[in-house]
């Protein structure tokens, strides 16, 4: 299997800066150039050992099962390729290594002729969703792949093959994630992909996310459009162009059926829509309704909710019960220096306003989980989509939270039109046509679900794909088995310690932080011994890891948006390390993958980046210093932006620091952060600084990698300076087309450097 390193960050917007996205011709030429380089590579015969982990797997995008033999099926992973099993998931074989991408949105199989059609480019539109190269076709179970078009699509929503005519294929194209483009909508081929015709076009911001078809009549098709705009600082995943279309002539012509008169939502709050067709009459849809709820959630009696501070007067604030205010401060993690007396004094003196208590708590995680939107709604039509009725009798809380763009799927049982499954963070099941629900994912089922197959001959037989891999049930979801043999986890970062054998640590997308000895061998034997070489040491989206060189039991790691801990592996004790701003100050902004660093000169000194550089002299127990804002500043939006993305310290001089930001700045300090010099004026502007590192061979040498992925710009940007950033030289002109995420200098030979990109190393 190809060794791919995916280091994931937030997203940039094309229109704001005018950055050019990569054209389809550049993309194809880049692939050809990369293939030529591989043929002539000095290390092409170098063997890599797979050390795991497979105890957890990676994000599934699609599952297709042989209708005549359910022990044979294919699984597509968002950035892990396509895998095949013929023994009910006991083992899998990768069949996508000969493709020129590992990123998949959806696929379909013509089981009669064993033809596989893959739509490349994940369709979930998340921070870690990578683009594809169009539609790929294989007639020999993945030994060879042919690109059959739509190379400027970037992300594919759905692929459907006519089971009675495999040359007829319908594709829902979602389009570019971070820029507008024309290759969106519904495309159809009648000759197996030799030529394509666009059958439905909405606009350059709206693509097709789902297609489902009457199981008895391929002529009757339903498709859902999705209007969205993504930028580094904002994601608008909804719009009035999101809707449901129907075709009665096999996709040749389409009609919008989610009109205001139909009963289906048609306002600007409509987000991603998932579809499931039972027969010619009954159709289900789940919609991510981003409209605000009319009524806020109820607050517990005898408790203060942060929302009350939004419009509270100083006079009313001073009347607050001291015990209730102290409980509020303690329960919400305010620094100990703030008690009711201190806070009331600050408000009375005018140093802060009551609103500041609410703002103090509003970081990126609260926005993601606590914003009071309607969320997932289930609709049903019993007249072929002419009219729709909302079925859920209560809010489906915590199914989507605020990020329904990441899910958006629904399935109806092939044998019971009143039994449906809806999935987001959990899977929920309804046996009464969507009125009431119960959860059916249990202890050994990972959260965040993306696909579900229901056996038409045995509807209690389910195969589920989620962020942690594959699960199977034979009792309608009461019990599940894990099928996690593929090693397809998506790493944000890796690090190693100095033990013998040394341990490898890694933070993974939605799979936490794991560690294992470097000589680990992937084997099913752990099912017998009960011991897996890989150990979980953190949850959430696993982020960066730093290891104390004096004592490898001391680990610094954490999850998204700056939630970091110092962990003692021996005792299990965890110390929370995230810096806080003071009441009345502008809130700190933390990157999704906030950078951390232990000083090479003193392992008690811990650096962490928000929009400022924070320095602790005692392992993060408190923060003795914070810098000025080292970014271009805050930008209005619902995603933290203007944050630090990279930190390094020179091994030649204590306190010589360099930091990079997500909005394209690189700053250098030679006095421990007291003063800073901007050194990126002559570099390409506004690109994400994925890495900025000092050389370990030359004291004034700095390397910088910039990443245009968030502009849909996939060119490599690698620069070197030999005078502390006064002048830069580009050294990436002879590299293949791929965004660069990480750079490492060889510890023994200054002329050898290593790069990790979106398409390999």
Language-model-detected regions and their locations in the chain:
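Bacterial Sec-dependent N-terminal signal peptides
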Residues: 1-24
